């Protein structure tokens, strides 16, 4: 009888009658958030510790800079919670989340089961309850058995609920090719097409540590303020990269930007040549800079 009463009520609700109704935006409504305040200076110094504060004054590789950025983000936003395989006690497969569990505790740096569906499901549940989750998928190849958590649940819920419910999150995913001689079908996964096919999803993929920091800050802002879902693809091959053109040149180490972010409509432009334009991202940008140097020096093409 209860089900029948509910059905009788629902059947009288307005239906989608026009093409505009059917094609309504999947993007959830923005929400007003209090402007975050900078963490107390003494607390920040205590949280980072002397060694990392000292390292912050020198150029670093991408893995270290992402670690700095996540520390600052968690200091600034108390509702940010991270979850994933080995991200806490171990500090991540590549050390990207090193010391974060010691800094913020296991309730904000959650070591999960080796199950990507559970990781993303936990993120969805936390988002429902006012948190800003940052789930980590250990390798892009591991996402595919759980991608319906994003396509069928998180990304489409705002549309299905007419904006009443949302699942804002920043999904960090280590991916792209990174190891010579290791099959591309397993850990070395470059299959971004499945993410591009998810309506309403934002994909971000930095090529260097400085951009990674600025883009991660913007991704968190988009999740908090605009209730968006962002797939933040981190190129494994660039995590520890130090050099660009030759051994020891330190051309891929960058200073930690204390402030600022990169908005979605910003692009990076390198060089002022007029002969050729190379458009790329992630690992491709790094390799394109090397190719551009060869083209200019050996073929006088800029």
List the model feature ranges, each with a label.
Residues 1-23:
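Active-site or pore-adjacent capping/gating segments
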Residues 5-8, 12, 72, 102, ...:
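A generic structural signal for well-ordered alpha-helical segments enriched in polar/charged residues
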Residues 9, 125, 194, 291-294:
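Residues within well-ordered alpha helices
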Residues 21-26, 291-293:
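Composition- and surface-driven signal marking solvent-exposed, interaction-prone regions
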Residues 23-229, 233-239, 245:
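Thiamine diphosphate
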Residues 65-73, 214-229, 238-299:
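Glycine-/acidic-rich phosphate or pyrophosphate-binding loops and their flanking alpha/beta elements
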Residues 131, 300-301:
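Short phosphate-binding/catalytic loops that engage adenosine nucleotides
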């Amino acid at each position: 009888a209860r089900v029948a009463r509910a059905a009788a009520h629902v059947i009288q609700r307005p239906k989608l009658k026009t093409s505009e109704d059917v094609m309504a935006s999947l993007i959830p409504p923005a929400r007003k958030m209090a402007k975050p305040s900078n963490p107390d200076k003494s607390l920040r110094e205590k949280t980072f510790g002397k060694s990392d504060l000292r390292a912050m004054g020198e150029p670093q590789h991408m893995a270290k800079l992402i670690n700095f950025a996540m520390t600052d983000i968690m200091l600034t936003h108390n509702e940010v919670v991270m979850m994933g395989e080995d991200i806490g006690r171990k500090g991540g497969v590549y050390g990207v989340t090193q010391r974060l569990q010691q800094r913020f505790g296991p309730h904000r740096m959650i070591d999960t089961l080796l199950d990507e569906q559970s990781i993303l499901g936990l993120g969805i549940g936390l988002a429902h309850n006012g948190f800003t989750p940052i789930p980590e998928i250990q390798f892009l190849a591991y996402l595919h058995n759980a991608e319906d958590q994003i396509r069928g649940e998180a990304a489409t819920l705002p549309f299905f609920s007419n904006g009443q419910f949302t699942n804002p999150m920043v999904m960090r995913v280590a991916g792209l090719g990174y190891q010579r001689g290791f099959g591309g079908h397993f850990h070395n996964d470059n299959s971004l097409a499945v993410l591009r096919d998810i309506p309403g999803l934002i994909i971000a993929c930095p090529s260097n540590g400085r951009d990674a920091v600025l883009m991660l800050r913007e991704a968190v802002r988009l999740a908090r303020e605009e209730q968006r879902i962002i797939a933040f693809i981190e190129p494994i091959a660039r995590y520890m990269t130090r050099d660009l053109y030759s051994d020891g040149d330190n051309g891929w180490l960058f200073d930690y930007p204390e402030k600022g972010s990169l908005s979605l409509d910003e692009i990076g432009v390198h060089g002022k040549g007029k002969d050729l334009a190379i458009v790329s991202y992630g690992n491709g940008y790094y390799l394109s800079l090397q190719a551009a140097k060869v083209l200019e020096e050996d073929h006088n093409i800029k």
